[in-house]
């Protein structure tokens, strides 16, 4: 997806420009399948049979590193890990990197490949997975009244973010603009959201403050029973607070 994003953007960083183009690919877990396989080999054949590449393949930031190597991008390079928010945070943090002047462009995205026995067992034990095995096509239904959990999937997505003047100077056609980004924590529980959703609302308000205007709602595709009501409450609190600030 990084190759597709660069091709669509028409961006081929070479020479000194490659020093100003970075990579930020987020992942929630990293190379879990490599870790799973290494554990299996060690149990069955002993530690000397574990490939030394395990140490590299399991690291979450290797996706960013491999993209940088493939395209010769020598700018800022790291990853973010923030569970279900990882991809969104990657875009936001990359935008902040550009705004503070540490890059003129960033290849940004998210990737995940957690369909392994260990991951499925772990999520199953938390009670988070859908058990609608008899109807897999409709198992993932985050906004349905009868939702019963989420479905683990694999995938990747990539974007190219650029400083606006840089994009226009080289004749690129911007598809969208990141005008505000906010981040906040509930500091409440390892998996359950804070009941009033103030952390989520606070992140929305921070994004709005940076943008100087109202932002578009982006509902997270969560299928847990408490997900939809809390998400609606977050957005409602977010707009009420914005109205209060505007009236002050």
Spans of model-derived segments:
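Active-site-proximal alpha-helical scaffold in enzymes
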Residues: 2-12, 60-63, 68-71, 76-112, ...
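Condensing-enzyme catalytic core mediating Claisen C-C bond formation in acyl metabolism
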Residues: 134-219, 232-235
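Short glycine-aspartate micro-motif
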Residues: 20-24, 104-108, 140-142, 175, ...
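Generic structural signal for well-ordered, non-membrane alpha-helical segments
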Residues: 56-60, 64, 87, 91, ...
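Short glycine/serine/threonine-biased micro-segments
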Residues: 20, 24-29, 81, 85, ...
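Conserved beta-ketoacyl condensing-enzyme motif
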Residues: 1-82, 111-120, 214-245
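Acyl-CoA/ACP chain-elongation machinery
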Residues: 102-148, 181-195, 224-230, 248
């Amino acid at each position: 997806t990084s190759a597709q994003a660069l091709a669509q953007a028409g961006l081929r960083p070479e020479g000194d420009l490659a020093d100003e183009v970075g990579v930020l690919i987020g992942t929630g877990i990293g190379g879990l399948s490599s870790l799973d396989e290494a554990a299996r080999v060690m149990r069955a054949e002993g530690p000397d049979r574990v490939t030394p590449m395990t140490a590299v393949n399991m690291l979450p930031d290797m996706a960013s590193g491999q993209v940088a190597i493939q395209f010769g991008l020598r700018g800022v390079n790291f990853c973010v890990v923030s569970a279900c928010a990882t991809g969104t945070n990657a875009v936001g943090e990359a935008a902040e990197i550009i705004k503070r002047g540490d890059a003129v462009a960033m290849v940004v995205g998210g990737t995940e490949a957690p369909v392994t026995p260990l991951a499925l067992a772990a999520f199953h034990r938390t009670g988070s997975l859908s058990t609608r095995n008899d109807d897999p096509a409709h198992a993932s239904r985050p906004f349905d009244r009868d939702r019963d959990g989420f479905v683990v999937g694999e995938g990747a997505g990539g974007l190219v973010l650029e400083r606006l003047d840089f994009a226009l100077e080289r004749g690129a056609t911007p598809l969208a603009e990141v005008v505000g980004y906010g981040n906040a924590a509930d500091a409440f529980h390892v998996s359950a959201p804070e009941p009033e959703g103030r952390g989520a609302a606070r992140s929305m308000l921070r994004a709005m403050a940076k943008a100087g205007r109202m932002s578009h709602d982006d509902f997270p595709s969560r299928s847990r029973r408490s997900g939809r009501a809390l998400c609606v409450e977050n957005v409602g609190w977010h707009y009420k607070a914005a109205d209060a600030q505007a009236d002050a």
